[in-house]
A protein has these predicted regions:
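Structured, active/binding-site neighborhoods that engage oxygen-rich ligands
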Residues: 1-396
């Protein structure tokens, strides 16, 4: 398999496994482990809780998709005009569109994403208060004011690492490690202002960009050294300005790695890391589950959602990591968490939208200001990211 095809599969895997973890955890997000056990047995929830025939995603997946749409609109705008801001600067306007889907706020007239045109994006799935309040400020053209370290920033940041990987696979320059870390911080910090609300996003971004190019066997051997490298980059960038927070994040990350090699049960280990309601804890829980269950995407995600805390976010972040390791073909073949006889694409809500976004992230921008739009692929790209039309997507 050539590098472009391989990375495309890993990008698909990261987004789809994240959505699967989100959907699995969404069913138990607001109940504790003892209640989960009463409802699903001592092993916890291990299969999708279906609404009709679909496993429903939460606001985590919604916002991840809008993040990706904003990034892709940004790179396209730069290509078509020859100038522009960095792609991560365009997620702000994409989040305005997400806010519109949740509120139908009439002040938001212009659309900057084709996702906004899809009726299926308008479902309310327990959107986070911090994200909603921050987006309200963005709509008012104010800077969001809070000191939140909630997990609403890190759970949506993966697309910047995936976009970067798509460019690298095609031997096109994109970001340095430092620039990539800053991009992750920018995306999370636009809504969450506490350092522990945005620094973990840099770690996740760096981790995904590193492991996505490796074989599963190589990741299993090297993941701890990769995490150490990620910590080093974040420490160099932010260790002076946010010294105490960086030191704490380093200690928590090391604790997650230590318990991943212990004889503790998943529930016992996760209890030492938190509940996942904050970005630092969500990062630590997802990392523990991925390292401890490095050879099984199912076991990793199941562990990540069966605890007392923010199950959909920890499941989603763990899915981002595990999907970037094993790829989409692997999880599709296994129909993870699906009823017997049904595929992941059939079962997971918005799977067609998720895969379309994933493929666009892996493609890199197809057009520029001098382009004749002389192929169907270029025309589709123009309609999605210049005209904001959901071309090629079935509307429900």
């Amino acid at each position: 398999m050539d590098q472009v095809t391989y990375i495309k599969d890993m990008i698909r895997g990261s987004l789809m496994a994240a959505a699967a973890g989100d959907a699995l955890g969404y069913a138990v997000e607001f109940i504790d482990k003892s209640t989960i056990d009463k409802l699903y047995g001592s092993d916890g929830i291990m299969a999708f809780e279906l609404n009709g025939s679909k496993a429903l995603i939460s606001d985590d997946t919604q916002m991840s998709l809008f993040t990706a749409n904003g990034l892709l609109m940004g790179v396209t705008r730069c290509a078509m005009r020859g100038i522009g801001s960095r792609p991560e600067e365009y997620v702000y306007v994409a989040y305005r569109d997400w806010y519109y889907t949740q509120t139908r706020d009439r002040r938001i007239e212009d659309s900057y994403s084709w996702l906004r045109a899809l009726p299926q994006m308008y479902s309310l799935r327990a959107p986070g208060i911090t994200c909603m309040n921050a987006c309200e400020s963005i709509v008012q053209r104010d800077e969001p004011q809070n000191n939140s370290k909630g997990g609403g920033g890190i759970m949506r940041v993966a697309p910047i690492a995936l976009l970067h990987s798509g460019y690298i696979a095609r031997a096109r320059s994109f970001y340095t490690h430092e620039e990539l870390a800053r991009a992750g911080v920018t995306i999370a910090r636009c809504t969450h202002k506490h350092p522990l609300g945005f620094l973990p996003a840099a770690l996740l971004t760096l981790l995904l960009a590193e492991i996505i190019t490796m074989s599963p066997e190589e990741v299993a051997l090297r993941i701890e050294s990769v995490v150490a490298k990620c910590l080093s980059v974040v420490g160099e960038l932010y260790g002076v300005e946010y010294r105490d927070d960086v030191l704490y994040l380093e200690e928590l990350t090391q604790r997650a790695l230590r318990v991943a090699h212990s004889h503790l049960t998943d529930v016992e280990a996760i209890s030492l890391l938190g509940q996942g309601w904050t970005a630092d804890e969500a990062w630590a829980i997802a990392l523990y589950c991925a390292v401890h269950h490095i050879d099984s995407v199912e076991r990793a995600i199941i562990a990540a959602v069966n605890h007392d805390g923010d199950s959909d976010s920890t499941g989603s972040i763990c899915g981002n990591v595990m999907g970037a390791i094993c790829g989409y073909n692997h999880i599709a073949e296994r129909s993870i968490f699906c009823p017997t006889g049904r595929s992941l694409e059939q079962t997971l809500e918005l799977s067609d939208v998720i895969l379309a976004i994933a493929d666009d992230l892996s493609t890199s921008c197809l057009i520029n200001e001098y382009d004749a739009l002389d192929t169907p692929e270029k025309q589709l790209w123009f309609e999605r990211y210049c005209e904001m039309k959901p071309t090629g997507i079935r509307q429900m």
